[in-house]
């Protein structure tokens, strides 16, 4: 079990770590996940430190870096890393079974351009990622907190948009996706109001799913049931 934190901010836009009144029961790691954590973490794992990491040192090369917040079980992240060996990928996930599953899949796929954090994403972004160092930040299917009284817990808020902007290089892209239409509207409102961004949609709203974002099994099932998915892409200018 681990405490669950939520991205809340004060009036000045300062991130506040707040612990909700329940704990998340993560479930036990499978044998394969535990083995991957033991064998692959020394290779692909990044231990959190409160100072900026050197991406060239971490990956052993200079290349554009893509960072994904909350990669779940990691299947799509591994697929993207395998499809784009010229890019560096960093994934951040708080659920240990997901980290183990991602490491196992990455090892099986022979991926070498992926590193992962098992830590709070906001803390990693604030303290470990240098300003202007990322080519892309991906936030796919974050918790929608669909009840109105919980909307303040949504990770996409004005201070979060500014935090991401500060980590992107000029020309870098913040790519968001959600299967909740109300959350897509919230995302669009926040991002359109955020300074230093340009919406990549020709119509000023959402974009078609780009080929580089794999269609997940969950998403494919949603399409069959008539559920929508909304992608937003904003460029740092």
Swiss-Prot record:
Task of the protein: Catalyzes the formation of N(7)-methylguanine at position 46 (m7G46) in tRNA.
Pathway this chain belongs to: tRNA modification; N(7)-methylguanine-tRNA biosynthesis
CDD domains referenced in this protein's UniProt entry, alphabetically: AdoMet_MTases
Annotated residues for binding of S-adenosyl-L-methionine: 68, 93, 120, 143
InterPro entries, per the entry: SAM-dependent_MTases_sf, tRNA_(Gua-N-7)_MeTrfase_Trmb, tRNA_methyltr_TrmB_bact
One cellular component (GO) term of this entry: tRNA methyltransferase complex
Origin: domain of life: Bacteria
Top-rank EC class of the record's enzyme: transferase
Protein name as annotated: tRNA (guanine-N(7)-)-methyltransferase
Name of the gene: trmB
EC number: 2.1.1.33
Gene3D superfamilies, per the entry: Vaccinia Virus protein VP39
Reactions catalysed: guanosine(46) in tRNA + S-adenosyl-L-methionine = N(7)-methylguanosine(46) in tRNA + S-adenosyl-L-homocysteine
Binding locations of substrate: 147, 179, 216-219
Active site residues per record: 143
Pfam families: Methyltransf_4
Record carries keyword Transferase: yes
The entry's keywords: Methyltransferase, S-adenosyl-L-methionine, Transferase, tRNA processing
Disulfide bonds: none
PANTHER family with a match to the protein in the record: 3-DEOXY-D-MANNO-OCTULOSONIC-ACID TRANSFERASE/TRNA GUANINE-N 7 - -METHYLTRANSFERASE (PTHR23417), PENTACOTRIPEPTIDE-REPEAT REGION OF PRORP DOMAIN-CONTAINING PROTEIN (PTHR23417:SF14)
Similarity annotation: Belongs to the class I-like SAM-binding methyltransferase superfamily. TrmB family.
């Amino acid at each position: 079990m681990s405490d669950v934190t939520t991205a809340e901010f004060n009036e000045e836009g300062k991130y506040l770590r707040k612990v909700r009144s329940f704990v998340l029961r993560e479930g036990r790691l499978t044998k394969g996940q535990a083995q991957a954590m033991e064998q692959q973490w020394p290779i692909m794992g990044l231990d959190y430190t409160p100072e900026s990491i050197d991406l060239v040192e971490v990956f052993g090369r200079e290349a554009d870096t893509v960072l994904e917040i909350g990669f779940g079980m990691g299947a799509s992240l591994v697929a993207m890393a395998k499809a784009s060996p010229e890019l560096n990928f960093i994934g951040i996930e708080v659920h240990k079974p997901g980290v183990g599953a991602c490491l196992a899949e990455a090892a099986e796929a022979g991926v070498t351009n992926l590193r992962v954090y098992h830590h709070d994403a906001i803390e990693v972004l604030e303290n470990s990622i240098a300003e202007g160092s990322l080519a892309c930040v991906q936030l796919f299917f974050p918790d929608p907190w669909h009840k109105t009284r919980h909307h303040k817990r949504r990770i996409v808020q004005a201070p979060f948009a500014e935090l991401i902007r500060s980590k992107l290089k000029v020309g870098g892209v913040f790519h968001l996706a959600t299967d909740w239409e109300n959350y897509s509207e919230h995302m669009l409102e926040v991002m359109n109001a955020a300074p230093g961004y340009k919406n990549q949609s020709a119509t000023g709203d959402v974009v078609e799913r780009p080929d580089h974002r794999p269609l997940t099994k969950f998403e494919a099932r949603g399409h069959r049931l008539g559920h929508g998915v909304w992608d937003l892409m904003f460029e740092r200018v």
